[in-house]
């Protein structure tokens, strides 16, 4: 029986959905970070349970031809790029397999073609938003990323998958915080001022927003700090402060203040302009989000007399992208600020046939049914937990012909597809899209169509 610190030779036979290597020894399944299929390694046992164990690589005996040898291991240890050690074409194959496996294991579907995952030409430096913790490391204020499964900060300047201008802004901010002797947050002591730095940059506009997340309102000499920062980066149009005094892992608290400029940046998506506020959800990979949304629009095969429901509508990016091609759009979003953003964004783009309400998706769906609104197409883009059963049932009762489902969690997507099939819909098309290159995450668009007769 293997025990902690034993070293054993193993072959990696698979990857978990999170990108860890899988090895089988003495009837146990071991999970090993930074190990790829076909690799033979000496594995040190870290932990053993009744059926599973965890190990780490002591030595590579045979390495995979698909290993990316150039990756800085800091990106693996932090989880920034937990699939970065796998060559990009193989990452795309891995993601296609994740979708196929979920559809088969959860929904029992094996007879629908899953298209190859749509990837990026340049799969690095793509993130338009950074959320960076600020902590003291070896007596110095540092910015970086937490080690995987911990709150130990690893100082980093180049985040590999972020817009390089954002990385430059973070480093400049770090240096200014040091210069003005502003204290980093200390989780254990519940002390210090600066918790996190959040930076957004418009992919097309180049506009930059900086958010200082602090434990209390007063920031000593913040005006001088902002003045120095804007000298370096004149593209900054917004500096916000968010106050979070709670003992929590949540980035933002409830109180927001505008320290400089406006409280939003503007950027484009599929030809429309969008105002993006500090707390607003906006896809972090603009290039691939456009591919994702365009795929959903193409799948829906929209016509000028279509009535479209846009559930989980965010700031209106999907619904407003289709509004000019259809009769009406009805959007629902549970976050009030996002609904206000949607309405402003409709005005910004001279769109008058898009209507937004603040409610849960299932409540709004039921209310629209009562009001006699009969959608022909439903677009859904739910959070990771997927759709609720009540929403699926209510949306099925509308008689909508087509449902385009955008998913950020293929397991919950497969679960939801299973119920839709029971309620009279067929799965017609499946297209995975790589919004998060170098990570194990995969987005997917599927088309569900109502069965005839």
Task: Name every feature range the model reports, one short phrase each.
Residues 61-69, 73-184, 204:
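Extended interfacial segments that mediate partner engagement and assembly in macromolecular machines
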Residues 198-202, 208-218:
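Carbohydrate-binding surface patches
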Residues 21-26, 144-148, 211-213, 342:
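Short, acidic/hydrophobic/Gly-rich beta-strand patch recurrent on exposed beta strands
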Residues 115-122, 187, 196, 432-435:
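Short, solvent-exposed loop/turn elements at beta->coil junctions and helix N-caps
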Residues 153-195, 216-240:
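Internal alpha/beta scaffold segment
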Residues 2-9, 17, 217, 221-453:
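Rossmann-like S-adenosyl-L-methionine
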Residues 1-74, 107, 355:
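Terminal RNA-binding accessory module
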């Amino acid at each position: 029986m293997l025990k902690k610190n034993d070293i054993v030779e193993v072959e990696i036979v698979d990857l978990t959905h999170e990108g860890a290597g899988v090895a089988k020894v003495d009837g146990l399944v071991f999970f090993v970070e930074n190990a790829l299929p076909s690799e033979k390694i000496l594995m040190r046992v870290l932990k053993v349970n009744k059926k599973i164990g965890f190990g780490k690589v002591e030595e590579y005996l045979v390495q995979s031809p698909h290993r990316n040898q150039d990756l800085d291991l800091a990106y693996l240890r932090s989880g920034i790029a937990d699939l970065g050690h796998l060559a990009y074409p193989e990452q795309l194959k891995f993601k296609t397999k994740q979708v196929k496996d979920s559809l088969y294991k959860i929904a029992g579907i094996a007879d629908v073609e899953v298209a190859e995952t749509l990837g990026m030409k340049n799969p690095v430096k793509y993130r338009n938003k950074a959320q960076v913790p600020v902590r003291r490391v070896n007596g110095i204020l540092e910015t970086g990323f937490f080690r995987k499964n911990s709150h130990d900060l690893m100082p980093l300047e180049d985040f590999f998958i972020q817009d390089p201008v954002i990385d430059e802004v973070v480093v400049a901010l770090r240096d200014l915080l040091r210069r003005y002797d502003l204290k980093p947050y200390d989780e254990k002591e519940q002390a210090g001022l600066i918790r996190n730095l959040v930076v957004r940059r418009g992919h097309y506009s180049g506009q930059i927003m900086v958010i200082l997340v602090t434990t209390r309102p007063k920031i000593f000499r913040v005006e001088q700090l902002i003045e120095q920062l804007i000298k370096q980066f004149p593209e900054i149009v917004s500096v916000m402060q968010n106050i979070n005094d709670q003992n929590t892992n949540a980035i933002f608290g409830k109180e927001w203040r505008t320290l400089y400029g406006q409280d939003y940046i503007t950027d484009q998506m599929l030809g429309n302009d969008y105002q993006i506020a500090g707390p607003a959800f906006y896809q972090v990979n603009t290039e691939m989000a456009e591919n994702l949304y365009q795929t959903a629009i193409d799948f829906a095969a929209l016509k000028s007399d279509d009535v479209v429901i846009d559930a989980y509508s965010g700031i209106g990016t999907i619904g407003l992208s289709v509004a000019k091609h259809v009769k009406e759009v009805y959007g629902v979003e549970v976050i009030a600020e996002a609904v206000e953003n949607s309405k402003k964004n409709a005005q910004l783009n001279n769109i008058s046939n898009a209507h937004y309400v603040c409610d849960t998706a299932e409540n709004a769906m039921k209310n629209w049914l009562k009001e006699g609104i009969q959608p022909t197409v439903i677009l859904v883009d739910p959070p990771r937990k997927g759709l609720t059963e009540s929403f699926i049932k209510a949306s099925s009762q509308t008689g909508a012909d087509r449902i385009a489902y955008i998913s950020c969690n293929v397991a919950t997507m497969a679960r939801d597809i299973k119920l839709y099939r029971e309620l009279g819909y067929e799965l017609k098309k499946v297209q995975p899209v790589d919004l998060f290159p170098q990570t194990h995450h995969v987005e997917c668009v599927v088309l569900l169509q109502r069965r005839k007769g």
